[in-house]
Curated annotation (Swiss-Prot):
This is Small ribosomal subunit protein bS16. Belongs to the bacterial ribosomal protein bS16 family. GO terms for molecular function: structural constituent of ribosome. One of its GO terms (cellular component) is cytoplasm.
Length: 96
C-alpha cells in the first residue's frame, strides 16, 4: 500500500478549503482517508491565522514510516509553512 500525504478538497464552488490528510494513493481525492492531520485555506492571506494548520508530530510520524507528500504538501514544507518534527516510527514505538 502506497501512502500519500495530500490535500482533500472541501468547500463550496469557487471557495475551496482543503484538509491535509494521509490516504492510500489508490483512493480518490475526496475519498476515505487514514488520518486527517491539518487544513489549508487558500482564501485567507498567506501567514494569517487560519491559513494553514498541521499537527507536526503526526506529520513527522507519517514521513518517518515512509508516506510520500504530494507536490503541494512538499512545497509547504520547503517554504517553512509546515515544521515537520523529525522522528521515525521506530523511535515512537520504543517510547510507547
Amino acid at each position: 500500500m502506497s501512502v500519500k500525504i495530500r490535500l482533500m478538497r472541501l468547500g463550496a464552488k469557487k471557495k475551496p478549503f482543503y484538509r491535509i490528510v494521509v490516504a492510500d494513493s489508490r483512493v480518490q481525492r475526496d475519498g476515505k482517508c487514514i488520518e486527517q492531520i491539518g487544513f489549508y485555506n487558500p482564501m485567507v492571506e498567506c501567514g494569517a491565522p487560519g491559513f494553514l494548520k498541521v499537527n507536526a508530530e503526526r506529520l513527522g510520524y507519517w514521513l518517518g514510516v515512509g508516506a510520500q507528500p504530494t507536490d503541494r504538501v512538499s512545497w509547504f514544507i520547503k517554504k517553512g509553512f509546515i515544521e515537520a518534527q523529525s522522528g521515525s516510527a521506530a523511535s515512537t514505538a520504543q517510547e510507547a
